[in-house]
């Protein structure tokens, strides 16, 4: 077991705790309304409630979407930090898992596509975290439009890879868990998108709740990689970064595969 096992768990714990902290700050600063509030008005008078308590009158501008919670300081600063740190950790997890599957001689287009979608998800998170929806709406929506579909595709691809590589009952149990998480992510993401395009306050609030469930669900999915990351080593990262031709080369005098580019002349002649 290596310290890498803590990386996926840290991503889940740090990000989930962080976004709920951002939400709490936004509610206390009257920037959004609580998730339990389903009553919205067309307009509101100045809120007489003191800072530190939730708003007593809400409009559609106060729907507690995750992005909306991180739109204004001071919570926007924490939101950007979470987005940046989360994006880095997501990219690192994707790269390590890609290299780990290569070490197991599981070379497939699914693994490569999963790496691409995971890194695309990370890039989208960077944009979402640094361009707040109320200040750079177009860029924020572009980032969200990249991050959410890419994250969902990454989840689905790794469900397939989990079933493909299952050799023990516990492997199958993890694959089942990931399948359940993938289904939940798909349903909530679709519902969130469908509800979000409507002007109804009830549907807008429903979109916010679905978005929260979807994001937390995907973060939990990333956390499940701790199951495999106990076997990750520094060589795993080397395997992920190794040029493709070198992975199939064998060192002289050995029957085992080497990560060094010590190929036979016949292989070089084919290039």
From Swiss-Prot:
Keywords for this protein: Cell membrane, Glycoprotein, Membrane, Transmembrane, Transmembrane helix
Main localization category: membrane
Transmembrane segments: 3-23, 76-96, 109-129, 141-161, 179-199, 212-232
Family annotation (InterPro entries): DRAM/TMEM150_Autophagy_Mod, Frag1/DRAM/Sfk1
Positions in the Cytoplasmic compartment: 1-2, 97-108, 162-178, 233-271
Membrane-topology annotation of the record: Multi-pass membrane protein
Extracellular side: 24-75, 130-140, 200-211
Keyword Transmembrane helix belongs to the record: yes
Glycan attachment residues as annotated in the record: 37, 41
Subcellular compartments: Cell membrane
GO cellular component, one term: plasma membrane
GO biological process entries: phosphatidylinositol phosphate biosynthetic process; protein localization to plasma membrane
Assembly: Interacts (via C-terminal cytoplasmic tail) with PI4KA.
Name of the protein in question: Transmembrane protein 150A
Source species: Homo sapiens
């Amino acid at each position: 077991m290596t310290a890498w096992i803590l990386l996926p768990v840290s991503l889940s714990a740090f990000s989930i705790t962080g976004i709920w902290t951002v939400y709490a700050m936004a509610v206390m600063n009257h920037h959004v309304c609580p998730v339990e509030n389903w009553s919205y008005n067309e307009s509101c008078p100045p809120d007489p409630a003191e800072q530190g308590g939730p708003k007593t009158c809400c409009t559609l501008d106060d729907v507690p979407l995750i992005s909306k919670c991180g739109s204004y300081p001071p919570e926007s600063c924490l939101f950007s930090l979470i987005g940046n740190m989360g994006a880095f950790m997501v990219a690192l997890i994707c790269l390590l898992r890609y290299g780990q599957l290569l070490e197991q001689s599981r070379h497939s287009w699914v693994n490569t596509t999963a790496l691409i979608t995971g890194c695309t998800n990370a890039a989208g998170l960077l944009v979402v975290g640094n361009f707040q929806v109320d200040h750079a709406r177009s860029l924020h929506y572009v980032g969200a439009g990249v991050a959410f579909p890419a994250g969902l595709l990454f989840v689905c691809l790794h469900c397939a890879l989990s079933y493909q590589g299952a050799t023990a009952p516990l492997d199958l149990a993890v694959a089942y868990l990931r399948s359940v998480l993938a289904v939940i992510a798909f349903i909530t993401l679709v519902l969130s998108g469908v509800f979000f395009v409507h002007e109804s306050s009830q549907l807008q609030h429903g979109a916010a709740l679905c978005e929260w469930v979807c994001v937390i669900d995907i973060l939990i999915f990333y956390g499940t990689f701790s199951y495999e990351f106990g076997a990750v080593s520094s060589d795993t990262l080397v395997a992920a970064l190794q040029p493709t031709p070198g992975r199939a080369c064998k060192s002289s005098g050995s029957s085992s595969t080497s990560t060094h580019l010590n190929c036979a002349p016949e292989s070089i002649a084919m290039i």
